[in-house]
Regions:
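Signature of the catalytic double-stranded beta-helix
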Residues: 1-19, 25
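Short beta-strand or tight-loop elements
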Residues: 8, 21, 37, 75
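Short, conserved beta-strand element in jelly-roll/cupin
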Residues: 14-16, 32-49, 92
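A short secondary-structure junction signal
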Residues: 22-26, 50-56, 81, 91, ...
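A short hydrophobic beta-strand segment most commonly corresponding to one strand
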Residues: 37-43, 68-72, 83-101
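A short beta-strand-loop-beta hairpin characteristic of the jelly-roll/cupin
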Residues: 42-64
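Conserved metal-binding segment of the jelly-roll/cupin
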Residues: 60-76
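Long hydrophobic alpha-helical segments typical of transmembrane helices together
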Residues: 89, 93-133
Length: 133
């Protein structure tokens, strides 16, 4: 991906049918509001099982046609169990590279864009012990 500086780590995430992920952050609390981007391409499976938590602690689901997206790993999110195995190409750990002109253009010209408010407080269980200090 020529717009990535530095290059992001590429992995394949496999989520078996009937499995999900609890609400979590992919960052420390100190990183909230910084560039914690995660680039995803869903190769197979239910797309609309991914959701974010808004300021009222509601679940805000992504549309079922968002097969390619960038998400903010510092925003609380989760995955409901799906009826199909989900296979996702993931770039980022999360990727927190430079906002290059090409990457900025990619974000600004995206066909899809979701703005989800952030919860005013975080649940302790949302932060993985790995990220806790």
């Amino acid at each position: 991906f020529p717009w990535m500086e530095p290059e992001g780590r590429v992995t394949i995430l496999r989520t078996p049918a009937g499995y999900g992920l609890n609400v979590h952050l992919d960052s420390t609390e100190d990183e909230i509001g910084t560039s914690q981007h995660k680039f995803r391409i869903v190769l197979n499976g239910n797309v609309d099982k991914l959701y974010f938590i808004d300021k009222h602690k509601n679940e805000v689901y992504i549309p079922d046609n968002y097969y390619t997206y960038v998400l903010d790993g510092s925003h609380p999110h989760a995955l409901k169990p799906g009826t199909e195995e989900k296979v996702t190409l993931c770039i980022g750990a999360p990727w927190n590279g430079e906002l290059t002109p090409d990457y900025t253009k990619l974000l600004e010209n995206s066909l899809y864009n979701m703005k989800v408010s952030r919860p005013e407080s975080l649940e302790d269980s949302w932060t993985d012990p790995f990220w806790k200090k």
